[in-house]
């Protein structure tokens, strides 16, 4: 298949989502290419969180269309998204502080042996540790021993563990919700390096952030939501921070933002 005919990794069109009498999404649409980072921006209440929850299966859409690799897909539950290769790294990371790095990578999806007449299933620890090391090496993530409790890790290291867990399961698309929030300068730089490395390895990435400097450092495409609809989608190289801020705040007319 030629590059021109190759479908985009993800396309969302006309997404609508209501919570009772409140319409959270009224017309959301954007796309994500393989090997690229799409920054999803907007002020508080613009619909960013609802959009990623819709794609992740947490808050299924009421109307609209989601296409993955050119094919319409139905995502009604997080397990649907996982089966399609969509993983989300939420802001709280969902890590268990008392468990080690490897245990967190496989949390809820541990590899176990087949049952035998002589005893119960047992964890395949050696296999899990080997695969964990492979993924961490591929992503150039340097961490302490795999049995180190994540409670002892820095904020950047914890974020790295969550990202590694997201790509451990044959993922195609990784959604990141504010991955650099509350991180220091050095830790932020490392997480942004990870974001670009993911794209460089062929993953599609949706990045939610309020940091405009980070956006213009790592994003390939920028999509802006305002009041539940997409008001801007363009290549980062064709935009300026002022134009993006204007779309976010509503001081830039939608026609001018398109």
Model-assigned labels for residue ranges:
Residues 2-258:
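Glycine-rich phosphate-binding loops of nucleotide-dependent enzymes
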